A protein has these predicted regions:
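Compositionally biased terminal segments of proteins
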Residues: 1-235
């Protein structure tokens, strides 16, 4: 297993143990720290990028629910640092942990797919005594595509979100089938956004960067992206 992946798993486990069983049932782990957990190809895992934070989403009822949740986090050892400009960020012994509510009215931002992603999250056994909730791979792709649209500056070469997407396409052979059988609205969104991505002038370079220039894997990623882009159902 890649060193970066080992570090990421340790970070996730640290957060999970601090949260405890009860709070673990309320949150879902998302973002780049979870990419490797969804990848089944060991070669691809070697190229997983390191990220210095752990991201989670949570469903809370309005401001009162959000403040109550934050109090529970403080009781578990999470703190707010005055040095952090990210309003959803807390610290756990120096580790940056971002808790994002699925209601955009609470903090002024969210991701359009968070609510459905929470509802469809799957259990993942991280350790013998720890089970976390994780996005399904189609929702991982959808949340990353939505994030890329908002902060990627239309530059797949510089986007960590795009890097995570391409790594998952490369390292999860079953992804195309999983998207194919997903909810129509989700499937169409992914297919249409991937179609736009394939038209981008820099996508070839982005893919080459992710797969370290391996011609076989470049072709494989393109083939899977083409299949995904063809899953849109106009009807």
């Amino acid at each position: 297993m890649a060193r970066a992946q080992d570090q990421l798993i340790n970070m996730i486990e640290t957060v999970a143990r601090a949260l405890g069983t009860e709070l673990l049932e309320e949150v879902v782990f998302v973002g780049g720290c979870t990419t490797g957990l969804l990848i089944s190809d060991e070669v691809t895992k070697e190229g997983i990028r390191y990220t210095d934070d752990v991201d989670l989403i949570v469903n809370v009822a309005g401001y009162a629910g959000w403040h109550s949740f934050q109090e529970q986090l403080r009781d578990k050892g999470f703190t707010v640092s005055l040095d952090d400009e990210v309003i959803c960020r807390m610290r756990l012994d120096g580790l940056m942990v971002d808790f994002m509510p699925d209601d955009k009215d609470i903090l002024g931002f969210s991701n359009r797919w968070y609510k459905q992603a929470l509802e469809s999250a799957q259990d993942y056994r991280l350790a013998e005594d720890i089970v976390i909730r994780l996005l399904t791979s189609p929702f991982f792709i959808a949340t990353k595509l939505e994030a890329y649209k908002g902060r990627g500056n239309n530059d797949p070469l510089a986007s960590h979100d795009m890097e995570d997407i391409l790594n998952l396409v490369d390292g999860r052979p079953e992804l195309v089938t999983e998207i194919q059988v997903a909810d129509k609205r989700l499937r169409d969104f992914i297919a249409e956004e991937i179609g736009r991505l394939l038209d981008h002038d820099l996508i070839d370079y982005a893919i080459q960067g992710v797969v370290m220039g391996d011609p076989g894997r470049v072709n494989l990623v393109f083939e899977r992206l083409e299949k995904i882009s063809g899953l849109s159902d106009p009807g």
